[in-house]
Structures are given as C-alpha cells and as structure tokens.
C-alpha cells in the first residue's frame, strides 16, 4: 500500500515566504521531481531595484486553483481521491521526490500524516501580521498564481492566516534552521547539490546576480534563504 514515501507535503500561510525556499530546494536538489513546472504555472514580482520578492513556480493545490479544488474540505475526501489530485500536474509521477504544496494543508495536518505516514511534512511560519503584510507586498489580491479567491477579502485573509499559523504551531516543532545543509538533510535529501550553471540551465530566470558567485558566497545565500524563517519538518 502506498504510504507517501516519495512525497514532501508542504504548507504555510499566505505571506510566510514559503514559495521562494520551495523553489530554491527544487532547483538545488537533484532528487526533486519538477515535472509539474510549466510556463503557465508562474508568478514573479520584483521590487524597484529588480530583486525578486515573489517567486511562484510549479503546481499549487487548493480551491479555485487548477488542482485540489476540494482541499479546503480534505477531511471529506478519501486517500485515493487526494492522491489522484496530487498526481495530476506531474508529467512524470514515477521519478524522484514530489513536492505537494497547499495553504489548505494547514487545516488537515493530522489527516495527511495518517494518510501518508511515510511522507515528509514541511511547514513555514511567520507571525500573522508579518504574513499579511508580506503577502500584500508581493502583490496581494493582484497575485494571479496561485489563486486566493477563497480568502475573499483582507479581513478574512487575516483571520485565516491566524488559523493556519495556529494549526502549524500545534502540529510542528518549529525552529530556525542553522543553514541549508541542516534543513536539506532533515528533509531526507542529499547535500550534493547542483552548481549555479546547472541551475541556470533548468531556470534561466534564476536570479542572475548569483551567476558568478564563488562557492562560499553561494552557500551563504542558501544559508540565508533556509534560515530566514521558522520551519517545521516531520520526517517519516
């Protein structure tokens, strides 16, 4: 019976800055299956200096999105129905580790662990107001991918961020990781990662200021990304 041994199930409230770290992990780690990436599953926002502050790639699951329409009511779905939705965006399901990401997983963490006991579960945490403010900073209601229609308005967005964060705090032992190697190892992945030129081949839009970084600068950048927020990891 399938138990999710090749899954990394990820959640975080809107504005928790999860997308950039997830995207970076998928680029540096050779084991990650990125066959859910298409030119349509993209959102990017840059600040006035050209720095990327919104970096959404690959499938997101949840109501009003292309996959996981009923994931706000995931407790009403069977394991088979959930797994069917997980598989849909991947051109090649049978290879590597699949990252499955949804804000709505925060409402169903114990159920997901029960359904997929061998999956690695990963969460991101930032305080409610900081999440709300950052989400607006990267586009707010103008973000077109993923879709946030379910949250309706600012009042409900703030309310649901609070609920999601509370659920995450109750389920995970949150900590600020010392750097990328600690986090990647705890996620069950190899620290033998891609070089910057290899990443640029996969994603030419990868922030070009790092193209000529020396190894120590590259590692410092990765450390900063993986240690900037509290995260929780539950391995199988």
Residue locations for each model-derived region?
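PAPS-dependent sulfotransferase catalytic core
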Residues: 1-85, 194-220, 236
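Short, well-structured alpha-helical segments in soluble
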Residues: 84-92
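PAPS-dependent sulfotransferases, especially Golgi type II membrane carbohydrate sulfotransferases
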Residues: 1-6, 156-236
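PAPS-dependent sulfotransferase catalytic domain
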Residues: 93-192
């Amino acid at each position: 019976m399938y138990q999710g041994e090749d899954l990394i199930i990820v959640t975080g409230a809107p504005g928790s800055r999860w997308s950039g770290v997830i995207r970076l992990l998928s680029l540096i780690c050779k084991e990650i299956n990125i066959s859910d990436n298409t030119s349509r599953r993209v959102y990017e926002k840059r600040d006035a200096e050209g720095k990327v502050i919104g970096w959404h790639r690959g499938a997101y699951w949840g109501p009003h999105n292309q996959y996981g329409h009923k994931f706000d009511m995931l407790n009403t779905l069977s394991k088979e129905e959930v797994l069917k939705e997980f598989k849909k965006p991947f051109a090649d399901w049978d290879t590597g580790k699949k990252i499955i990401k949804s804000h709505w997983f925060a409402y169903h963490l114990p159920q997901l662990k029960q359904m997929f006991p061998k999956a690695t579960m990963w969460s991101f945490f930032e305080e409610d107001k900081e999440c709300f403010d950052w989400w607006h900073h990267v586009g707010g209601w103008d973000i077109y991918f993923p879709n946030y229609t379910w949250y309706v308005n600012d009042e409900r967005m703030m309310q649901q961020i609070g609920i999601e964060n509370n659920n995450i705090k109750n389920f995970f032992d949150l900590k600020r990781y010392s750097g990328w190697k600690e986090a990647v190892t705890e996620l069950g992945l190899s620290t033998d990662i891609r070089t910057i030129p290899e990443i640029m081949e996969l994603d030419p839009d990868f922030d070009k200021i790092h193209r000529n970084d020396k190894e120590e600068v590259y590692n410092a950048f990765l450390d900063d990304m993986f240690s900037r927020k509290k995260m929780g990891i539950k391995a199988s």
